[in-house]
Design a protein with these regions (language model features):
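Primarily extracytoplasmic/secreted proteins
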Residues: 6-218
Length: 218
């Protein structure tokens, strides 16, 4: 198990409503069906805190994410994309207590490495506002509608050497395997956005899967 060293510092953003904090990214360079990421930081505890996890994996056959638990809480799937070489999904749960815990990602079959990115939301609605996924395209297109004072979070799993995000700020890049790249990005928005053209452009196009979610304020 490892944590990436790029853009690792937790950062908080607010649009006057939702407070968005990028927390961490962790990878596992072992082939498994069930990945347990132990003692992952959840950031500061707060009533109604929403934890968002973007998970991805390389695959040698079509795989999907069957479930995610965050600190023992079953997460809700926001969006998921899958193809024969990779899969990526965004999940979330309300976890009001605890500053760390296990995040368990279960796939439909054995995968070739996996990684997660983790964000925390304070002052956010408990249910996602909009969700989107995309696969087998470059750029990966993830258009989202976002309420005023809301936030958006996205991630992708590919073999591109670099990722360039449009309309979200990249928080991390990690390599669960040398030829795999997992990236995540996020932002807050003061004004309402309708079908904002969020996208990820890859330096090379293969095994492209991505997903994203938006939340409004309480």
């Amino acid at each position: 198990m490892f944590q990436n060293n790029l853009l690792m510092a937790a950062t908080s953003l607010s649009a006057g409503g939702v407070i968005l904090t990028y927390i961490t990214a962790v990878g596992d360079a072992v082939n498994r069906t069930v990945y347990t990421f132990s003692s992952v930081s959840f950031g500061d505890a707060s009533s109604g805190r929403v934890i968002v996890v973007n998970a991805g994996a390389g695959t040698s056959a079509a795989r999907t994410i069957s479930s995610v638990t965050i600190g023992g809480v079953t997460a809700t799937q926001a969006a998921q994309a899958a193809m024969s070489e990779s899969c990526n999904g965004t999940f979330y749960a309300v976890v009001s207590t605890g500053t760390s815990g296990d995040i368990v990602v279960t796939y439909s079959g054995s995968c070739n490495r996996s990684g997660i990115g983790v964000w925390g939301l304070a002052g956010a609605a408990a249910t996602a506002h909009d969700t989107v996924s995309d696969s087998a395209s470059n750029p990966i297109a993830l258009p989202l509608s976002i309420p005023a004072s809301g936030a958006a979070i996205g991630g992708c799993y590919t073999n591109g050497a670099t990722h360039s995000w449009a309309n979200l700020t990249e928080n991390f890049e990690q390599n669960p395997e040398a030829s795999h790249l997992h990236s995540g990005a996020s932002a807050t928005f003061e004004e309402e956005q309708t079908d904002l053209a969020i996208a990820v452009t890859l330096s090379s196009a293969s095994m492209e899967t991505g997903s994203a979610v938006s939340f409004g304020p309480i």
